[in-house]
């Protein structure tokens, strides 16, 4: 009985950890949307800012991957 409650808590925690993946998607959308907005205002500067955009996307996606790993650890290690 006690093991079932612990397993249920692990599944609830894994579900809550997955909300970080939604936050990563919002972050990537924000970064790319602002880049496109800036590129439309000043197309000549867009080429020099592309690398910065990809770094921002990588950081936002890293948070999503970390939350996914936490969810996997909660589901299978607890």
From Swiss-Prot:
Cellular component terms (Gene Ontology): plasma membrane; plasma membrane-derived chromatophore membrane; proton-transporting ATP synthase complex; proton-transporting two-sector ATPase complex, proton-transporting domain
UniProt keyword terms in alphabetical order: ATP synthesis, CF(0), Hydrogen ion transport, Ion transport, Lipid-binding, Membrane, Transmembrane, Transmembrane helix, Transport
Residue(s) at site: Reversibly protonated during proton transport: 61
Main location: membrane
Membrane topology of this protein: Multi-pass membrane protein
Compartments (UniProt record): Cellular chromatophore membrane
InterPro entries: ATP_synth_csu_bac/chlpt, ATP_synth_F0_csu, ATP_synth_F0_csu_sf, ATPase_proteolipid_c-like_dom, F/V-ATP_Csub_sf
Transmembrane segments: 12-32, 54-74
Source domain of life: Bacteria
Gene3D superfamilies: F1F0 ATP synthase subunit C (1.20.20.10)
GO terms for MF: lipid binding; proton-transporting ATP synthase activity, rotational mechanism
PANTHER family: ATP SYNTHASE LIPID-BINDING PROTEIN, MITOCHONDRIAL, ATPASE PROTEIN 9
Subunit structure: F-type ATPases have 2 components, F(1) - the catalytic core - and F(0) - the membrane proton channel. F(1) has five subunits: alpha(3), beta(3), gamma(1), delta(1), epsilon(1). F(0) has four main subunits: a(1), b(1), b'(1) and c(10-14). The alpha and beta chains form an alternating ring which encloses part of the gamma chain. F(1) is attached to F(0) by a central stalk formed by the gamma and epsilon chains, while a peripheral stalk is formed by the delta, b and b' chains.
Function of the protein: F(1)F(0) ATP synthase produces ATP from ADP in the presence of a proton or sodium gradient. F-type ATPases consist of two structural domains, F(1) containing the extramembraneous catalytic core and F(0) containing the membrane proton channel, linked together by a central stalk and a peripheral stalk. During catalysis, ATP synthesis in the catalytic domain of F(1) is coupled via a rotary mechanism of the central stalk subunits to proton translocation. Key component of the F(0) channel; it plays a direct role in translocation across the membrane. A homomeric c-ring of between 10-14 subunits forms the central stalk rotor element with the F(1) delta and epsilon subunits.
Family in the record: Belongs to the ATPase C chain family.
Protein name from the UniProt record: ATP synthase subunit c
């Amino acid at each position: 009985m006690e093991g079932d409650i612990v397993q249920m808590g692990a599944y609830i925690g894994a579900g809550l950890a997955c909300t970080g993946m939604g936050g990563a998607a919002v972050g990537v959308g924000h970064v790319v949307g602002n880049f496109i907005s800036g590129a439309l205002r000043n197309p000549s500067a867009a080429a020099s800012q592309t690398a910065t955009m990809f770094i921002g996307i990588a950081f936002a996606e890293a948070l999503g991957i970390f939350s996914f790993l936490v969810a996997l650890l909660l589901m299978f290690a607890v």
